[in-house]
C-alpha cells in the first residue's frame, strides 16, 4: 500500500474498489455488478435454476475460457421436468468470461478516473468469494496489464482454514476493526463520520494483512 495498490472486493451484489498510495486510502468506488450477476448469466444461458447455477459457478466455473479443459464436463440440472444435460467446462466459461471482463473493465475505468493508475506499483489485489474462481488472476492481468493476486487474510489461530481465504476478508476486516475500536475505548458507531473512517481503516487492515 505504500507503493500503490488497488483492492478489489468482488462480493455477491457489488464490487468495491479502494485505491491506496503512500500508505493511505486515496479513492473508493462501488460498482453494482458482481458475483450474483455471473450466477444469473449462467442460470439464463443454461436454463437452470439459480441455486443450481450458483453451485455450477462455484464448483466448475472458469473466468477465462482458454484455461478451461474442453474435455471436462459438468452436469446442468434442467428447469421443471426437463432432464439434466452435460456441458463442457469450456462452454460454461464462455458464459462467465464476458461478465467478469465487464467487471474488470469497470474497475479499470474507476482506476483511470481516480488519477492513480500510474502509481499502482503493487498492482491489483482481489478479494471476495468470486475472486477464488480459476482464471480470475489471468484474466485480470490481461485487462489491467498489472500484477494481480488474491488477497488472503493472515490468520494462524483456531479455524485458520476457514477464515484465511479471500471470501472471509470482509468479515475478518470488520472483526479486526471492532477489536481495535474496543482497544481505543470508543464505539465506532458513536464517532462523527465513523462510517467513512471505519471503511478506510477496514480496507487498510485488509491490504496490510495479505
Language model segments and positions:
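Helical "lid/coupling" subdomains associated with nucleotide-phosphate turnover
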Residues: 1-7, 16-210
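Short, glycine/acidic-enriched loop or turn micro-motifs at the edges of active sites
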Residues: 12
Amino acid at each position: 500500500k505504500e507503493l500503490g495498490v488497488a483492492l478489489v472486493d468482488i462480493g455477491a451484489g457489488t464490487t468495491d474498489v479502494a485505491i491506496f498510495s503512500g500508505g493511505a486510502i486515496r479513492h473508493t468506488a462501488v460498482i453494482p455488478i458482481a458475483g450474483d450477476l455471473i450466477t444469473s448469466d449462467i442460470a439464463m444461458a443454461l436454463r437452470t435454476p439459480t441455486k443450481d447455477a450458483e453451485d455450477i459457478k462455484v464448483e466448475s466455473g472458469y473466468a477465462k475460457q482458454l484455461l478451461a479443459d474442453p474435455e471436462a464436463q459438468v452436469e446442468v440440472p434442467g428447469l421443471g421436468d426437463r432432464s439434466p444435460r452435460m456441458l463442457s467446462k469450456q462452454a460454461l466459461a464462455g458464459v462467465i468470461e464476458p461478465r467478469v471482463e465487464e467487471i474488470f473493465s469497470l474497475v479499470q475505468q474507476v482506476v483511470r478516473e481516480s488519477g492513480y493508475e500510474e502509481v499502482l506499483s503493487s498492482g491489483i489485489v482481489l478479494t471476495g468469494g468470486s475472486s477464488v474462481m480459476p482464471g480470475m488472476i489471468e484474466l485480470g492481468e490481461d485487462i489491467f496489464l498489472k500484477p494481480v493476486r488474491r488477497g488472503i487474510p493472515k490468520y494462524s489461530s483456531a479455524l485458520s482454514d476457514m477464515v484465511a481465504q479471500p471470501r472471509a476478508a470482509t468479515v475478518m476486516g470488520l472483526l479486526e476493526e471492532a477489536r481495535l475500536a474496543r482497544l481505543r475505548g470508543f464505539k465506532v458507531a458513536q464517532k462523527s463520520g465513523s462510517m467513512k473512517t471505519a471503511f478506510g481503516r477496514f480496507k487498510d487492515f485488509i491490504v496490510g494483512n495479505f
